[in-house]
Amino acid sequence: MSYYTKAKFFTSAPDIRHLKNDTGIEVAFAGRSNAGKSSALNTLTRQRNLARTSKTPGRTQLINVFELEEELRLVDLPGYGFAKVPVAMKKKWQASLGEYLQKRKSLKGLVVLMDIRHPFKDLDQDLIHWAVESNIPVLALLTKADKLKSGKRKAQLLMAQEAALAFMGDVTVQTFSSLNKHGLPELERILDGWFGLDKKSDEEGAVVEGQD
């Protein structure tokens, strides 16, 4: 069973100023309003309704926090960039996202979700630049990979990996599909590293071996 099935709703906040508990480790998920962020979180946690998927992109305006265990959290940041959202609201969200990435001490990793057919749009790039400037590792997750045939999917991945070099930071690119769970093991492996779960399992294994 995956560790991430333990996720449960912890709190919501309109912006970083209302977020408490800036201790422990947080990993944030961010993306354009139609990038499949909620679906990816639900797939990761094996929970159909942990993150609510909206048929109207741009409706999720709150920062939603899910707790895995004490001091370990997944953070669902507001979707951005949807055309029908008022400009003033867009600017408010962008400012809030930037502030969170630059000031949140417990943030140890950022997953930026992008439709594999349209990666690295302006706001995606802004988000990654902010993270790199704050020395936060980034996973650029190319979602909806099931929409492309294998050859085209690999070509898009190579193109995105090439583009990611320009950020001059710790930016990994991976393809993903919530529909067929393509890329899920790779996503979990990266999250395990950010949360320190790989070290924890190694330490537990060493203890067991020492007891033999």
From Swiss-Prot:
Transmembrane residue ranges: none
Assigned GO CC terms: cytosol
Gene3D superfamilies: P-loop containing nucleotide triphosphate hydrolases
Domain of life: Bacteria
BP GO terms, sorted: division septum assembly
Record-given protein name: Probable GTP-binding protein EngB
Annotated binding of Mg(2+), by residue: S38, T60
PROSITE patterns: G_ENGB
Residues involved in GTP binding: 31-38, 58-62, 76-79, 143-146, 176-178
